[in-house]
Amino acid sequence: MQFSAGVNLNYFYDRAVNKEFKDIDIFLNNFQQSLYQLQHAKFPVVSCPSGLAIGGGYEVISQTSFIAAHSNSVLGLVESLVGLIPAGGGCKEMLRRWANHSDIKNDPKLLSLKVFNLIGYATTADSPIKAKAQQFLGDKDVMVMSKDRLIEEADKLIFSNKENYHPLDNASFSLPGSTVMSEMMDILNELKDKKVIGEHGIEVGKKLGYMLSGGDTNSSTRL
């Protein structure tokens, strides 16, 4: 059984074909606001993925207080494989998770490029151990060997953290803005030359790069 492989793309395809773009906007806004409320709840929330937790499925678990992941969990943001970018907070979460990592050393350009490659290449981790290395799981998250113990481990996380619990503050980090876009375009053009991606892949990469670079900003501005 899978946790979630993300949203039903047929829903979006049908509405795009019928030019019902307002319905798409409403769906995405509701999804984003629901996950924001989940992340900022006044009590701890634990997700217990098993099997696939990718795309929108990963965006859900990434915004819970704690994750108790079964050992066979596969985690990642794979939207680029179908010509999309994560739209439920996944980009923000990966920036948050990598911002203070020792590999990044508080370098806004390194941060943007790291997450750009991670999401752009649709990187997945096929175990919780690998997921921690990619920051899909954090230090406070746990791996559970038996599915039968997922709820038990979730209960432990809740009861051991319910006293004086405080939800995460809003994500905040510095991003380089347009200064990193040329490097991102070099990556995209190389992939196009190798026939790994086509014109649409370039457009998807540009949108992803604009988002992860911070757009019209610079590294002296805290977002």
Regions found by a protein language model. Name each.
Residues 1-22, 32-48, 70-74:
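A structural preference for short, pocket-lining loop segments at secondary-structure junctions
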Residues 2-5, 33, 53-57, 76-77, ...:
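Flexible loop/turn segments at secondary-structure boundaries
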Residues 8, 60-61, 130-131:
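Hydrophobic/aromatic residues within transmembrane alpha-helices
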Residues 22-45, 55-59, 64, 106, ...:
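Phosphate/diphosphate-binding loops
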Residues 46-54, 119-123:
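Glycine-rich beta-to-alpha transition loops that act as phosphate-gripper elements at the mouths
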Residues 55-109:
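CoA-thioester-processing core
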Residues 66, 119, 124-139:
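Long hydrophobic segments that form regular secondary structure
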Residues 100-123, 127, 145-223:
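Intrinsically disordered, low-complexity segments enriched in small/flexible residues
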